[in-house]
């Protein structure tokens, strides 16, 4: 679990940075473009253990992180406000909070569009058809357009965990097995 998900202080940092970035993107008229670029960086982060270590480890200096982020963004074609933002974050030694910043930006942008954001945890990546079906199901329940933020966590074994606002629906196999284990302990 990334540091950004385990610390309340980090959440505040992530939200402040995301809010500042959103204001700049709104002024520049690039809210959607910045979200696409951040999502691209988030996908790189999900796929690369080395990048996760760079982001999470205090061992790397701000200069090392800045150079690495610059090179990664250039190679990935991440440009404009998003790359400048990531460089500032690296310079300020806040890369550990980038996953939270991306989630917070996505939530702020969705709220600006009149959508709500659902955080979805799945044991494996969802294909486009599954995402579309999930969005439709959530829209029928909430009555609003829903943007989904998918996190892959193989430890849930199967099923989904869906968080919309303060509500959570946990259909993960891990939770079902834990419930069964507790029930069996009570019986025997």
UniProtKB/Swiss-Prot annotation:
One of its GO terms (cellular component) is proton-transporting ATP synthase complex. One of its GO terms (molecular function) is proton-transporting ATP synthase activity, rotational mechanism. It is a peripheral membrane protein. It is found in: Cell inner membrane. Its main location: membrane. Belongs to the ATPase delta chain family. F-type ATPases have 2 components, F(1) - the catalytic core - and F(0) - the membrane proton channel. F(1) has five subunits: alpha(3), beta(3), gamma(1), delta(1), epsilon(1). F(0) has three main subunits: a(1), b(2) and c(10-14). The alpha and beta chains form an alternating ring which encloses part of the gamma chain. F(1) is attached to F(0) by a central stalk formed by the gamma and epsilon chains, while a peripheral stalk is formed by the delta and b chains. HAMAP family: ATP_synth_delta_bact. F(1)F(0) ATP synthase produces ATP from ADP in the presence of a proton or sodium gradient. F-type ATPases consist of two structural domains, F(1) containing the extramembraneous catalytic core and F(0) containing the membrane proton channel, linked together by a central stalk and a peripheral stalk. During catalysis, ATP synthesis in the catalytic domain of F(1) is coupled via a rotary mechanism of the central stalk subunits to proton translocation. This protein is part of the stalk that links CF(0) to CF(1). It either transmits conformational changes from CF(0) to CF(1) or is implicated in proton conduction. This is ATP synthase subunit delta. It comes from Agrobacterium fabrum (strain C58 / ATCC 33970).
């Amino acid at each position: 679990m990334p540091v950004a998900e385990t610390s309340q202080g980090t959440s505040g940092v992530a939200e402040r940075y995301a809010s500042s970035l959103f204001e700049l993107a709104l002024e520049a008229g690039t809210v959607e473009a910045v979200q696409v670029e951040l999502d691209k960086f988030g996908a790189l982060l999900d796929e690369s253990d080395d990048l996760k270590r760079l982001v999470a480890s205090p061992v790397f200096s701000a200069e090392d992180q800045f150079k690495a982020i610059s090179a990664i963004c250039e190679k990935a074609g991440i440009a404009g406000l998003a790359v400048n933002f990531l460089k500032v974050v690296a310079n300020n030694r806040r890369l550990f909070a980038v996953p939270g910043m991306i989630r917070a930006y996505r939530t702020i942008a969705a709220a600006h569009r009149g959508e709500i954001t659902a955080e979805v945890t799945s044991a494996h990546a969802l294909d486009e058809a599954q995402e579309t079906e999930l969005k439709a199901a959530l829209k029928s329940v909430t009555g609003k357009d829903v943007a989904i933020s998918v996190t892959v966590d193989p430890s849930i074994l199967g099923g989904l965990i869906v968080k919309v606002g303060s509500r959570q629906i946990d259909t993960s196999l891990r939770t079902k097995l834990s419930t069964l284990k507790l029930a069996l302990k009570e019986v025997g």
